[in-house]
Amino acid sequence: MTPVVALVGRPNVGKSTLFNRLTRTRDALVADFPGLTRDRKYGHANIAGYNFIVIDTGGIDGTEEGVEEKMAEQSLLAIEEADVVLFLVDARAGLVPADIGIAQYLRQREKTTVVVANKTDGIDADSHCAEFYQLGLGEVEQIAAAQGRGVTQLIDQVLAPLGEQLNADQAVENEENSANEEADEWDTDFDFENEDDTALLDEALEEETEESIEDKNIKIAIVGRPNVGKSTLTNRILGEERVVVYDMPGTTRDSIYIPMERDGQQYTIIDTAGVRKRGKVNLAVEKFSVIKTLQAIQDANVVLLTIDAREGISDQDLSLLGFILNAGRSLVIVVNKWDGLSQDIKDQVKSELDRRLDFIDFARVHFISALHGSGVGNLFDSVKEAYACATQKTSTSMLTRILRMAADEHQPPLVNGRRVKLKYAHPGGYNPPIIVIHGNQVEKLADSYKRYLSNYFRKSLKIIGSPIRIQFQEGNNPFAGKKNKLTPSQLRKRKRLMKFIKKSKK
């Protein structure tokens, strides 16, 4: 599971600044779920090689309603679900009574807590932070979130003790990036015209991704808001006799993993709780299901985003969709409760889908009735198609040919009077497909041309249901920083020339 880090503290200590600093490092979409608790934000971060979910909680001020009551309203569930709590304090303002009250509450929760003194820039940090040791929560870490100073070291120190869970996540990340590192070694002497070179590179990349692709058990996460028919869809897929054992709607804290088999294919259905509307969250029962839904998305191969045809697309649906795309997961859109609608209403729903979801035109859309079972069986065809596209192997030579065709049809733009040169492309990973393009000045390509390349590769490779990630590698000059070694003849000539220059200056 993806680790969860919660940011807590009184107002104006820099929680949101640190949240933005963490999520910006990967340019992640910050998914805002209004109504669960006001001013709560969730985002995905990648710092120091660690992937984790970060929660920005509302400020806690114990002077009005008491620390415990305010904590229960704003941050209790975040603390309960977090693996690590970062307790932010203001180094400039010093220790205040509200900090002491929050610290007392955190000690009672027996949760891993780290005191983080923010705003240490421009002051004697050691002397200003000494008083925070009175909180009794161990060492005090010093950062300046606005400038980013100390943030990487903080995350590395905080998350490293989590051990095997994070090491596994980091190993997956390293596995995805190993192909890029391998390609960097080829960059100076790789000949993409030579079939032997491309075959060797494909073989190296294939070894890196063989294990992940050979995993034939497809994990399907069914996500969406409550009352969209998510549980009914799970019941229809699994059968009633299975639901009695596994289904616990509205009360479970964890996502339920249910193995099943269909037509000889192994699946794991991940049943998740829903993301509720404003004012509909029962804190005593729901147990912060949003985090579990986000973790289920991270763990799945294919995500079924379930939408209620009668209510249309909500902000919660778009927030979940953003997190799915950011996680790089394959996607199938499921519009439920399609039965009983008039043709006019159906046309309106389809028009709204086309308008609001035009940026994910690669995903299949299914109109079903989970209650009556119509259209449910067709979902598995799209699931297998999306998974196959996300894990298909493509050779370097084919990707390079597609890159050339794309450049011939629409040349790269000029940058400072020089045209961007695209040399070759190779696979950089799978699930989602990663295409690495090498060239000169590629970091200066306009976003519009990057989208053009992404769409061209998708159309050429016929990838359905899975996002494509395009990464660009700048071609390094192998002679940069090196001086030519002169021959003896050149040295003698240089010596004569220097003598002539000195003589002419006299």
From Swiss-Prot:
The keyword Nucleotidyltransferase does not apply. GO terms for biological process: ribosome biogenesis. Keywords: GTP-binding, Nucleotide-binding, Repeat, Ribosome biogenesis. SMART domains: AAA. Residues 3-166, 218-391 form the EngA-type G domain. GO terms for molecular function: ATP hydrolysis activity; GTP binding; ribosome binding. GTP 2 binds at residues 224-231, 271-275, 336-339. GTP 1 binds at residues 9-16, 56-60, 118-121. Associates with the 50S ribosomal subunit. This is GTPase Der. It comes from Actinobacillus pleuropneumoniae serotype 3 (strain JL03). The gene is der.
